[in-house]
Amino acid sequence: MTNFRRTLILAIFALTCICVAAQTPAPVVVELFTSEGCSSCPPADDFLRTLDATQPVTGVRLIVLGEHVDYWDDQGWKDKYSDHNFTVRQQNYADKLKLKSSYTPQMVIDGAVESSGNDRQRASQAFENARTQPKVNLQISSMKLENGVLRAHIESGPVPASADVFVALALDHAESQVLRGENGGHHLEHVAIARTFVKAGKASKGTAFAGDVKLKAHPSDGPYRLIAFVQEPNQGKIVGAAVQSLGTEKLHQGN
């Protein structure tokens, strides 16, 4: 093989790799801290649903996750999707991002930038900025539903710094008729509601992560999606993410 031909083949291969990379949307995780008891939250919930459905940012795959906090539950309406763990997670972000306090609705983009869930302009700018950040490859495989439990395998590429791997089982869609509280009399819709959220493991600097996870599901709910992401320690920047739909299947509780 001549040097010219070898050089030409290598050039074509390099261009092919660049094209493939350019065609792969960059995953950007959008966490929305929300509550059915908060009158400012429904517009943010609608915004999250729009982002999920339309994917408006070229070159970006927005991976949305609704995390319902519980500090509104004593204000006239108990949100059935609320979980104190999300209140704690939001407070950790408030400490990390040096905020005076937690609030709803709040968006956190890739663990690095926060904004009001109703500030669409600031959020959109954060999505654009996140697109250029390097990301670790992350894959979800071998998913299996059985007796109200989801099992899956998670693999990542080498991480640039030590990181935690989180996995969330999220309900695709839900609706509620709120009877009391600030949203009393209103019909609310949600998307990607986190129902189970666990830390799957850790990866050391320069190493890849590979592990199996087992998540308990809420019976008779569905369909679901599985979301995984790699996050720097102490709820730092999210450096990789993936989402896998479970289609139209529901999870059923075993006997």
Feature annotation, model-predicted:
Residues 9-17:
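Bacterial N-terminal signal peptides
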Residues 18-22:
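Sec/Tat signal peptide C-region and signal peptidase I cleavage site
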Residues 24-39, 65, 167:
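Short active-site neighborhood of thiol/selenol oxidoreductases, capturing the structured segment around
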Residues 42-56:
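Typically the conserved alpha-helix immediately C-terminal to a functionally engaged Cys/Sec
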Residues 58-87:
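Thiol-based oxidoreductase modules, predominantly thioredoxin-like and allied folds used
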